Amino acid sequence: NSIGTYTIRYLNRPLAYYKDHLLINLERARWQYKSEKGSKYVIGNIAAFMLQAFNEEVDSILEMRICCGSVRNKTPLLYSKIYYMELNPYWNVPQNIIRKEIIPSYRRDTTYFTRNRMKVYDKNGNRVNPHDIKWAKYTAGVPFTVKQDNKEGNSLGRIIFRFPNPYAVYLHDTPSRWAFNRSNRAVSHGCVRLERALDFAFFLLEKPDELLEDRIRIAMDIAPKS
């Protein structure tokens, strides 16, 4: 690989800069990565755009590329527990994405909601025709919710892994496979996209049998093995 602008910029920083960052990260690692004895755990390396999954014996048994948040939408550092996975999830679009991306896209192309299989609802949960809304007047808050159907092309892909956190970020599949071929994979809104979401699902299951694995594959429109 050739040396680019970013590499030169970081090489020109003083040694004290890296020393301070090392001390900060060592302290962070000391309190952040605390797995329960005898339990599986996962580490997402944001800087390397990689994820490692470890079994109860602390053996790394799964490794894959990931996509993380962009410079404007950084993936937060956190520690949590994965509680459940959801197949073919709907995407409830965050308010900031509605305001900053979806509304401008719709104003440029009024077929945006239809093409992306998105539906609009008012605060009472009633479906609203997006053509009847004066979107231009909503510059701060938007009194509507937008939900993307759980069909092919859904931004969350075919499966999502949910865990408690104050940032509304998760691990999930993605239809945007092209990003995994990039060296810089800072392309998301903050969530972590998994290169091999199906393998990750099998890792999390206690003792998956072939029947259960095939049921998951079928739900994700993947051909069963048996």
Feature locations, PLM:
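Well-ordered beta-sheet/strand-loop patches within structured domains
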Residues: 6-226
